Amino acid sequence: MNYLHNFKDTLFVDLLEVLNIVTIGEEHVNQLNLSGDASLSASSESSNMSFNSGSEENSQEKSVEDLEKQNCEINIHKNSDKEADTKKDPFLVTFNGEDDPLMPYNWSTNKKALIIIQTMLLTCVNYMGSSIYTPGQLEIQNEFHVGHVVGTLNLSLYVLGYGLGPIVFSPLTEISSIGRLPVYMITFFLFTMLQIGCALAPNFAGLVILRFITGVLCSPALSTGGATLGDIVSQNYLALVLGLWSIGAVAAPVLAPLLGASMVVAKDWRWIFWLLFFCCCATMLLLTFFFPETSSDTVLHRKAARIRKLTGDNRYYTEKEREEAQLPKKQFLIETLYRPFSMMITEPIVLAFDLYIALCYGAFYLFFEAFPIVFGGIYHFTLVEQGLAYFGFCVGCIFAYIILLVFSIKVAAKRFANNTFTPETTLILAMCIGWCIPLALFMFGWTAKVHWILPIISEVFFVLGCFNIFQASFSYLAICYPKYVASVFAGNGFARSSFAAAFPLFGQAMYNNLGTKNYPVAWGSSLVGFFTIGLWVIPFVLYKYGPSLRSMSKYNR
């Protein structure tokens, strides 16, 4: 019973409800009087869950006591602004005050921690899918007789897919009747099943198509994961939690090549996808039982739906349902699907950070082209040793998160305490740490032949900058556009994934054309480094002009 109470909006419990095995509610209705002031009195009952006996003998004789056993909770909305609106609406379903345990913000710490861990795990598994392929690329090229650029399509199209997916999926998660959970579970289930197709692909064209589709399907976890964390974590701690989530987002694609290399050495490239399939199955099992719906609008929608079902009265509604019902479906779809692009084009803040993050993300995936040149071509590392060379990024994640903690405690927390915190406070982190990215690119390029440890050290600096710029920008965007955070992240995901998909395609050609015998990756890395220096001015500009830009935004009202 305790499990059903704490995880009632999980996929497993949803199935139990659909099959009428359990009936779920919060508090029951004692008396409903729609005359006069439309008053409603409610009482509580010790049990919140009731199992159906399967018998329907007394189903035709429901009384008030029967309704009491259905455990419904109805909260009354009251507008005190005008005398005419003082009457209560018994059909408006809301949270039962700010301390309502049904509200995601008020869930227990243990429950929130479990959701955070599962969100990180889901993100890790999906991000692994991008780079776990790279150790097997040469084998795939040889088996299907394709060149390097064509072989790289399996990486690029996967990354492009999870940039395109959020344009459709992220707005859907903002619809109260859908929410986050169905989008997560349906897409991840299909993603898991298609790994079997990748492992058994008979030709290269089929593999490329499946990789693109799986990239699209994995996108909800990557783009909406931050919104899920924002559903349950207050703004005071959101930056820290997003930092933890981002560790998984960075660590997964850099650890995946080591796992992929192990599979290639032990078996062959097809076992890369079998390994990913098994990881997905384990994750899917955990999410089925312990990952609940987190969107507050959808939690209320589910509450209202249960009341409608148990009372047989379809007049119960939520404010969000009423808003969505009044908007024509065609217009609603246009707005939700068009909004990420609209905000990217019309909002200078969104556009600026989309460009900055896209370049950083593209530079990150450029390392997957540079590593074989440096560690394979210069130092003759084996396939597994090349996978180990990515550990510099993991070390960088640890130091980067420490910097984030220090900033949050020493700067952000103090400004929260004395009420001087503004969205621009988060930009201080990006302003102070942005120099690490160009330094890392220059260091990686010009010290590649000095000693193998120096390029690995440059990975640490790259993550120090990239990680904290991501945290600063995502926190800033989330605070500036709280109502449309999923759409903002969807547009950002499209921008950065487009860059990340393109960089591996021209990466090797760029290094070959710009490189010299003594400096094979120097000028190529430096070219990207110069662009990162130019975009480093963005947080400085927004720190000064951000408030005025936000005041003019129609999405910030």
From Swiss-Prot:
Induction profile: Expression is induced by benomyl via positive regulation by the transcription factors AP1 and PDR1. The promoter contains the YAP1 response element (YRE) 5'-TTAC/GTAA-3' which is recognized by AP1.
Keywords for this entry?
Cell membrane, Glycoprotein, Membrane, Transmembrane, Transmembrane helix
Q: Where in the cell is it found?
A: Cell membrane
Q: Name one GO molecular function term.
A: fluconazole transmembrane transporter activity
**What residues are glycosylation sites in this protein?**
33, 48, 106, 418
Identify the domain of life.
Answer: Eukaryota
Task: Say what happens when this gene is deleted.
Answer: Leads to increased sensitivity to benomyl, diamide, and menadione, but not 4-nitroquinoline-N-oxide, cycloheximide, or fluconazole. Increases the intracellular accumulation of 5-flucytosine and clotrimazole.
Q: Could you state one GO biological process linked to this protein?
A: xenobiotic detoxification by transmembrane export across the plasma membrane
Q: Where are the transmembrane segments?
A: 113-133, 149-169, 181-201, 204-224, 238-258, 271-291, 355-375, 387-407, 426-446, 450-470, 484-506, 521-541
Specify whether Membrane is a keyword of the entry: yes
Cellular component, GO annotation: plasma membrane
Q: What CDD domains does this protein's entry cite? A: MFS_Tpo1_MDR_like (cd17323)
- Composition bias type Low complexity, residue spans: 44-57
Per the record's keyword annotation, is Kinase included, yes or no? no
Q: What topology does the record note for this protein and the membrane?
A: Multi-pass membrane protein
Q: Where is this region: Disordered?
A: 44-67
Briefly state the protein's biological role.
Multidrug transporter that confers resistance to 5-flucytosine (5-FC) and clotrimazole. Also confers resistance to benomyl, but not 4-nitroquinoline-N-oxide, cycloheximide, or fluconazole. Plays direct roles in extrusion of 5-flucytosine and clotrimazole.
Q: Which NCBIfam families match?
A: 2_A_01_02 (TIGR00880)
What family does the database annotate? Answer: Belongs to the major facilitator superfamily.
Protein name (record): Multidrug transporter FLR1
According to its UniProt entry, this protein's organism is Candida glabrata (strain ATCC 2001 / BCRC 20586 / JCM 3761 / NBRC 0622 / NRRL Y-65 / CBS 138) (Yeast)
